[in-house]
Amino acid sequence: MLNYLATQDESKCCGCGACVEICPQKALPMKPNKEGFQYPALDANRCVDCKLCEKVCPEMNPPQKAEPLDIYALQSKNAEELFESSSGGAFRLVADSVIQQGGAVVGCVWNEKMEPVLTIADSLDGLRPMQGSKYLSSSTEHTYSQTKKLLDAGRMVLFTGTPCQCAGLLNFLRKPYDNLLTMDFLCHGVPSQMAFDAYREHCEKQRNGKMSQYKCRDKSAHGWAISESYCVNGKKYTAHGMTSPYLFGFISGYFNRYSCYTCKFRGLERFTDYTISDFWGYQQKLHNHDGISAFQVNTQKGKEFMTRFEQNARYHIAKREDVAVENPAILHSHEENVPELRKTIYQQIQTDGWAVVEKKYLRCRHFYLKKLWYALPDHVTIKLRKLKH
């Protein structure tokens, strides 16, 4: 099979960066395309045709997958960590245990330019910025090679990332490590940095200041729901997912990288030790609205390690069908057509600006009614929902 470097077919590159790090000649720098997605750019003068880039490419050589051993509805008992988590705090449960045993954790944080990047933490304090979803493409930086050094030195490492980033790491390592744990999540695709920056700059222009402390998921706004928040000039602004133009575009699949639409790594079968996601709908069974994770244990190694943190969690055995009610990607590989608006939106962001694109394409049905609804206090909306039923 021909890869992206041979075809320049953007759907054949997931942007994991494994080829960049494995190249002994440094002949594959990552460069953004017009839409802001990073792709390897071959320097033919440096290339010695060693084919290592092809060997580690997860698009060409996806890791072998297997069905999960167990699926749980899981929630951390630590109220503070639960509040800061997007759903049930599954990441912190595993990560805390790894750190407490002298290990290191690879996770995604915002840098000073408001770009998501993978970094390595070896303290509990370093885990806090890794919590919470970041709904755009992240850079792996040099974390594959740094992870390998830690593993070779005998340190335990928890590597967390998108499914394709985890696949890139496993291919980069080229052998199994007993001291490695991997955790991915049910991924809905990744927007580009350019799309997010256009939205951020639009918000900054509206608010006359610089954005900081952006959160894709903020429980202080509407509890466990998809609600964004950010600060400008010390003032906090919030929006429910369907009234945020950026999150509406993300949920609708308008911003995704082309490889996301034919992702090889979706579905119930996985190659990581753990897979986490929101367990939407399960809160009715538990009468708990603080956030619940669907926690999928995929390997025997993951099952054995769970005994080290299970006492810090509330959990129940669940069925895959329970998760699939609101997360159909857990059962299906979910190949889908590229939305017709996708190319138009990216083109018009560049030519007309975010404000035009937002007004034309990024407003949900009944936009103003939804804005009014989510402006109401929680106790009012709860009473209105009860009246409806």
Label each region the model flagged:
Residues 181-202, 327:
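Short, flexible loop segments at boundaries between secondary-structure elements
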Residues 101-104, 204, 208-389:
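Long, compositionally biased charged/polar accessory segments in the mid-to-C-terminal portions
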Residues 11-26, 48-60, 162-168, 255-268:
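Local cysteine-cluster metal-coordination motifs and their immediate loop/turn environment
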Residues 2-5, 18-41, 51-68, 273-274:
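Iron-sulfur cluster-binding cysteine motifs and their immediate structural context
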